[in-house]
Amino acid sequence: MKILNGAELASFVKVRQLKQVRNLRQSKKIIPKLSVVYVDSGNKVIDTYINLKKAYANDILVEFSVYKENADTIIERLNTLSRDDNIHGIIVQLPLPGDLDTDQILSHINPNKDVDGLSGGNFTPATPMAINWLLSGYGIDLSGKNVAIVGRGKLVGAPLIRLWKESGYNVDVFEKGDGYDLHIEIPKYDVIVTATG
């Protein structure tokens, strides 16, 4: 079994993005701005994800802002950011608290500013695209291969399943509590993607 390392790809992408942002700043006088919106649910992992995004944005010279909202204010914040011509990208940090309708909230992001591609617009979400690029970089074609995806979350699993099934690939999905013993099932597959967090 070969484990693919995304670190080289991530480094390449980061260098490329830094060049693109420098070009925007120098030749077009555009300062890219990214806003992250979240609802505090007490989940400390959210803080970690936001801090990682902030560090990445700083590394590639993108201005970064964070908005802590609640159930009553998040939609208005998203509408405001979506209308603001000075904001170029918006991310809703997931997961949202269970009592909120995630799809309904995401639908308030202007699709042209939806960095994660989750608002129902025409963009393929970023992580599934990165997985495709990683496979391509290693020369792996999924045609005729048996593919397993473990997890069907909104950010990775579900959009990857949809993308690959639409491409005609043979994809089986495994999720916690579905009754399968992954130690028995997974070795049967040519390509395995874990999308479990």
Describe each PLM feature range.
Residues 1-28:
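Positively charged, low-complexity intrinsically disordered leader regions
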Residues 3, 82, 89-142, 182-183, ...:
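Anion-binding alpha/beta catalytic cores of soluble intermediary-metabolism enzymes, centered on
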Residues 21-32, 80-85, 139-142:
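Glycine-rich phosphate/diphosphate-binding loops that line cofactor/substrate pockets in enzymes
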Residues 31-41:
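Short beta-strand segments enriched in small/hydrophobic residues
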Residues 38, 91-95, 150:
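Short beta-strand segments
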Residues 38, 66-70, 175:
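Residue-level recognition of beta-strand->loop/alpha-helix junctions
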Residues 39-55, 125-197:
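Glycine-rich phosphate/diphosphate-binding loop of Rossmann-like nucleotide-binding domains
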Residues 45-84:
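Active-site cofactor/substrate anionic-group-binding motifs, chiefly glycine-
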